[in-house]
Design a protein with these regions (language model features):
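Short secondary-structure capping micro-motifs at structural edges
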Residues: 54-63, 67-74, 96-103, 116-121
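Catalytic cores of nucleic-acid endonucleases
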Residues: 93-142, 150
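Conserved catalytic cores of phosphodiester-cleaving nucleases, focusing on short active-site segments
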Residues: 72-74, 79-92
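Short, low-complexity, polybasic intrinsically disordered segments
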Residues: 131-175
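Basic, amphipathic N-terminal segments that precede the first structured/catalytic domain
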Residues: 1-67
């Protein structure tokens, strides 16, 4: 039986110009280091480049319930907007760290669709990257790969990509 050939994901580096345009149109710009450490990242030397804090944008624009949204977005050199969800706390609280709680596929789908709906009224001048990046801590990355492989199963083009903070920074901010 022939296996389906999965397309490779091509990720473009961070674009200061596009991100500045997005930050101007959406407001809620925040230094990457502040956002990642606020989400639970434990990496040193995180750049100060600006990203858009989508959770803050969602809180500011929703009248009722806060829509489910990704944590951040930024512009890339291929004129696409990269959506990123931080999942550093899948290990739970201190006592429960041994049992990992994966994000559900439905939860991730809702975050992407709610984010796109939140941004749909804005003329952003760029499309969305086809992949949602999921950032995990180093100690959870192997399990995260298994989850993401399950989420992408049967898809010709992957919809999710797992990364550690170091991989993320090397791919987008130190290419």
């Amino acid at each position: 039986m022939a296996q389906k050939k999965r397309l490779q994901i091509s990720l473009a580096p961070y674009s200061t110009e596009l991100t500045k345009v997005l930050a101007h149109k959406l407001s809620h710009a925040k230094p990457l280091s502040d956002l990642l450490t606020g989400e639970g990242a434990k990496t040193n030397a995180i750049p100060q480049d600006l990203v858009v804090d989508v959770d803050a944008l969602a809180r500011a624009t929703s009248l009722g319930d806060k829509p489910s949204s990704v944590d951040m977005l930024f512009g890339c050199t291929n004129n696409l907007i990269q959506l990123v969800e931080c999942k550093y706390r899948v290990g739970g609280k201190k006592r429960d760290r041994k049992s990992l709680t994966p994000p559900t596929k439905r939860e991730l789908e809702n975050k992407v669709s709610d984010t796109k709906q939140l941004l749909s009224r804005k003329d952003l001048g760029a499309g969305f990257a086809p992949v949602l990046l999921l950032l995990f801590s180093d100690r959870h990355i192997e399990q995260a790969r298994a989850w993401v492989n399950d989420y992408n199963a049967g898809k010709k083009t992957p919809l999710y990509k797992e990364m550690t903070t170091t991989d993320f920074l090397d791919t987008f901010f130190h290419p």
